[in-house]
């Protein structure tokens, strides 16, 4: 089995990169997020690899981090999730955001992935909540804040700040995480506009 490939970027396809390793071109399928962050053609690159072997083919899946690869494996333990859907989830949520979405039950963020409807998103959140890998710890403050926002129990400035970031196009889980971080710096009594400004700064990092 292949665990890692290190070579030079040869070319890109719609959902794959061809990595030239000592003159051999390997077709490696990746999430859209990973492809966007790959070096340019002709530049060196390294990917962690998951190898899938079937009777009629061998397919390689590539990841920029071991965390992304582990989530790819974990997602496929849920019924109805294959390699394509798992890559779709990782295309819209990086590992840290996915861990937060699972921990907080944020089905809306998960269902943004292609091929993931509300039912499958709910199943993913429910079945993986207790299986989330130890390498993806979630801030307890984020879980508490997300729950308060969901139940309508969050202070109004906090709820308004999260809503504002969501309206700007950020997934609920990322908006909540940014505002949770903003609260730590600004304090519990901060106004919504202050939280929004600090939250946007967090998201820009």
UniProtKB/Swiss-Prot annotation:
* Subcellular compartments: Cytoplasm
- Return the similarity comment: Belongs to the RuvA family.
Taxonomic source organism: Methylobacterium radiotolerans (strain ATCC 27329 / DSM 1819 / JCM 2831 / NBRC 15690 / NCIMB 10815 / 0-1)
Q: Where is this region: Domain I?
A: 1-64
Subcellular location, principal: cytoplasm
Q: How does it assemble?
A: Homotetramer. Forms an RuvA(8)-RuvB(12)-Holliday junction (HJ) complex. HJ DNA is sandwiched between 2 RuvA tetramers; dsDNA enters through RuvA and exits via RuvB. An RuvB hexamer assembles on each DNA strand where it exits the tetramer. Each RuvB hexamer is contacted by two RuvA subunits (via domain III) on 2 adjacent RuvB subunits; this complex drives branch migration. In the full resolvosome a probable DNA-RuvA(4)-RuvB(12)-RuvC(2) complex forms which resolves the HJ.
The Swiss-Prot or TrEMBL note on domains reads: Has three domains with a flexible linker between the domains II and III and assumes an 'L' shape. Domain III is highly mobile and contacts RuvB.
Instruction: Note the superkingdom of the native organism.
Output: Bacteria
InterPro entries, alphabetized: DNA_helicase_Holl-junc_RuvA_I, NA-bd_OB-fold, RuvA, RuvA_2-like, RuvA_C, RuvA_C_sf
Question: Region entry Domain II: which residue ranges?
Answer: 65-143
User: Which residue windows are coiled coil?
Assistant: none
Q: What is this protein called?
A: Holliday junction branch migration complex subunit RuvA
- Purpose: The RuvA-RuvB-RuvC complex processes Holliday junction (HJ) DNA during genetic recombination and DNA repair, while the RuvA-RuvB complex plays an important role in the rescue of blocked DNA replication forks via replication fork reversal (RFR). RuvA specifically binds to HJ cruciform DNA, conferring on it an open structure. The RuvB hexamer acts as an ATP-dependent pump, pulling dsDNA into and through the RuvAB complex. HJ branch migration allows RuvC to scan DNA until it finds its consensus sequence, where it cleaves and resolves the cruciform DNA.
Query: What keywords does the record list, in alphabetical order?
Result: Cytoplasm, DNA damage, DNA recombination, DNA repair, DNA-binding
A single GO cellular-component term from the record reads:
cytoplasm
